[in-house]
């Protein structure tokens, strides 16, 4: 989230000439900003849903209609699904904007994606197997991520060989497009026609024993110590 993942800490470390793992200042800041990330992906032809920037002058009725009648509202630069809301009415859209605006001056609204949610880890240039996330919530929100015992993770994710190759290619392209390096995690969902849509890149994913990057690493035979070594090796090889 803000501070540790948006380039702030990275900038301080650069100023102090202290080496660190992961992406640099610019890439961290870009990845943290969902609006700028999505604009870049759209320019590059990478799959990501269209969006609107919400303000107090927004026409809530027209905007929700343009989003297909259902929307996910989120602060542009927050982590852990903080400030996000799922909406189905113009009034809810306005209320969701007010909630998100407490966390960020830029608030975006995307069409609501109701397909499967996946995350793909990248470590030292290697794309790890995708993980499918199944949350017993309206969406994979803060509680589902950190507190719920009802959130399930599947690795392998159940995708076909061709679809697994596709999601890995999209994830690596999105990661590289932002200038990210060493390691990270790319979040993706499927839309109503089962096409992958990029959500965001996490440049400092969780690294506890039950986090998703270690889970993906374990699927290819890397234990936690080996995973940490690969991340350090990626940084030292630069």
Region locations from a protein language model:
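Conserved beta-strand edge residues that scaffold enzyme active sites
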Residues: 2, 27-28, 54-56, 114, ...
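Phosphate-binding site of ATP-dependent enzymes
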Residues: 88-169, 190-197
């Amino acid at each position: 989230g803000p501070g540790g993942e948006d380039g702030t800490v990275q900038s301080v470390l650069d100023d102090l000439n202290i080496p660190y793992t992961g992406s640099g200042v610019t890439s961290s800041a870009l990845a943290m900003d969902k609006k700028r990330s999505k604009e870049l992906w759209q320019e590059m032809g990478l799959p990501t849903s269209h969006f609107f920037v919400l303000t107090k002058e927004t026409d809530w009725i027209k905007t929700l209609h343009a989003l297909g009648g259902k929307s996910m509202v989120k602060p542009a630069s927050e982590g852990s699904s903080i400030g996000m809301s799922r909406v189905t009415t113009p009034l809810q859209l306005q209320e969701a904007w007010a909630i998100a605006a407490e966390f960020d001056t830029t608030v975006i609204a995307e069409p609501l994606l109701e397909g499967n949610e996946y995350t793909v880890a990248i470590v030292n240039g290697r794309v790890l197997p995708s993980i499918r996330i199944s949350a017993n919530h309206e969406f994979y929100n803060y509680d589902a991520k950190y507190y719920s015992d009802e959130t399930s993770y599947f690795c392998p994710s159940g995708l076909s060989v061709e679809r697994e190759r596709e999601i890995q290619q999209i994830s690596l392209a999105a990661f590289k497009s932002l200038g990210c390096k060493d390691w990270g995690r790319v979040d993706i969902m499927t839309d109503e026609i089962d096409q992958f849509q990029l959500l965001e890149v996490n440049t400092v994913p969780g690294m506890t024993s039950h986090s998703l990057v270690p889970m993906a690493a374990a699927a290819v035979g890397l234990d936690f110590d080996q995973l940490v070594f690969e991340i350090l090796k990626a940084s030292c090889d630069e």
